[in-house]
């Protein structure tokens, strides 16, 4: 069962602030890891990599049961996605730190 995963230019723009925060080698590793995770999402509909802690978000504005996140790069980079199970579609939302993730 394959999933359709959409990662727009707006999604990738949320990765750019990490370029200033990390050395180039680490920044490129973050991008590479996100791309690998997208491939896994296409194949499985979830990320099963040990230590990435793929889970449903419970706080507003992501608390409707369809938003998920996984943690990469020493748990400091949070990747958020929206999953529509019935249509087997995943939309990548954004990449945040613990300080920058939107909350109400």
Go through the PLM ranges and name each one.
Residues 36, 52, 91-94:
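N-terminal functional modules and adjacent low-complexity/disordered segments of proteins
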Residues 1-40:
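Arg/Lys-rich, positively charged N-terminal/basic patches that mediate binding to nucleic acids
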Residues 13, 47-49, 88, 99:
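Intrinsically disordered/low-complexity terminal segments and short unstructured peptides
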Residues 39-71:
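A short, surface-exposed loop/turn module that caps and links secondary-structure elements
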Residues 1, 20-24, 28, 65-104:
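Enriched for short, Lys/Arg-rich terminal
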Residues 9, 16, 44, 60, ...:
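Short non-domain terminal segments
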